[in-house]
Amino acid sequence: MMGKEEEIARIARRLDKMVTKKSAEGAMDLLRELKAMPITLHLLQSTRVGMSVNALRKQSSDEEVIALAKSLIKSWKKLLDASDAKARERGRGMPLPTSSRDASEAPDPSRKRPELPRAPSTPRITTFPPVPVTCDAVRNKCREMLTAALQTDHDHVAIGADCERLSAQIEECIFRDVGNTDMKYKNRVRSRISNLKDAKNPDLRRNVLCGAITPQQIAVMTSEEMASDELKEIRKAMTKEAIREHQMARTGGTQTDLFTCGKCRKKNCTYTQVQTRSSDEPMTTFVVCNECGNRWKFC
């Protein structure tokens, strides 16, 4: 007999196939099966079924499928919210028992002294606490905005990620790297938020949510490193084009009055012809207006 986790994973795989084939036939039956199952946060995180349901919701044009998928995601979000609330309570409550325990053991100073070095021991320095706490208003506001960015498009529900904990860790890394909350810190936070919310670059957000990109990494990544693959290719092509045009401008070219500049309407131009395609195709002509600097090309 198939276990609950295996059954949910099987449904997730079938939903993924429907998304790949762009066919939602039978989706309602699978979604109803999921609705009837008592799904825990552990099952949500281990099977990643939320990602499959969310992908189906985005692709489907069937209103009934969309509505049921949204209902499931909403109910699973409550599991995450409950988990977040418990984590916050633990974060608030953990220091109190420690201090009260220290107080109860205070009568013997010789016992209290050796315990002090253990609190900031090496593991606490090299690893982050579950939820780094700060009382700074600016830092807390930045954490809220990072949380909102991570929650874009409900990917956190599908992945089963704790956005508040993640945002706190990311902000902590940024603060440690910059050292204060001045303009450099704010610009760093702002650029993370912008890239995490970018609808054209969902992979960055998903990689952060699932841990493929750690808080330490996202905290120091450049705009180029955070960019989508598509934008990276565009930037690469633009750089190549700029280098080529610069090299052509330095070669001088041939001065002519055969071309009319579309910008200043003068005929004082310099042109260069280059074989940019295969040898049996026409050469590309690059033209520079010597009057206003306007550039254009044609084959």
Curated annotation (Swiss-Prot):
Q: Where would I find the TFIIS-type zinc fingers in this protein? A: 257-297
Q: Which UniProt keywords apply?
A: DNA-binding, Isopeptide bond, Metal-binding, Nucleus, Phosphoprotein, Transcription, Transcription regulation, Ubl conjugation, Zinc, Zinc-finger
Keyword Nucleotidyltransferase recorded: no
Give me the Gene Ontology terms describing cellular component.
centrosome; ciliary basal body; nucleoplasm; nucleus; transcription elongation factor complex
Q: Tissue range of expression?
A: Testis and ovary specific.
Gene Ontology MF terms: DNA binding; zinc ion binding
| InterPro entries in the record | TF_IIS-typ (IPR035100), TFIIS/CRSP70_N_sub (IPR003617), TFIIS/LEDGF_dom_sf (IPR035441), TFIIS_cen_dom (IPR003618), TFIIS_cen_dom_sf (IPR036575), TFIIS_N (IPR017923), TFSII (IPR006289), Znf_TFIIS (IPR001222)
Q: Its Gene Ontology biological processes?
A: DNA-templated transcription elongation; regulation of DNA-templated transcription elongation; regulation of transcription by RNA polymerase II; transcription elongation by RNA polymerase II
**Annotated region Disordered: where?**
86-128
UniProt-annotated location(s):
Nucleus
Q: What's the stated role of this polypeptide?
A: Necessary for efficient RNA polymerase II transcription elongation past template-encoded arresting sites. The arresting sites in DNA have the property of trapping a certain fraction of elongating RNA polymerases that pass through, resulting in locked ternary complexes. Cleavage of the nascent transcript by S-II allows the resumption of elongation from the new 3'-terminus.
Instruction: State the oligomer form and interacting partners.
Output: Interacts with the basal transcription factor GTF2B. Interacts with REXO1.
Instruction: Name the family.
Output: Belongs to the TFS-II family.
NCBIfam families of this UniProt entry?
TFSII
Its recorded name reads Transcription elongation factor A protein 2
The opening ranks of the lineage are: Eukaryota, Metazoa, Chordata, Craniata, Vertebrata
Q: Which gene encodes it?
A: TCEA2
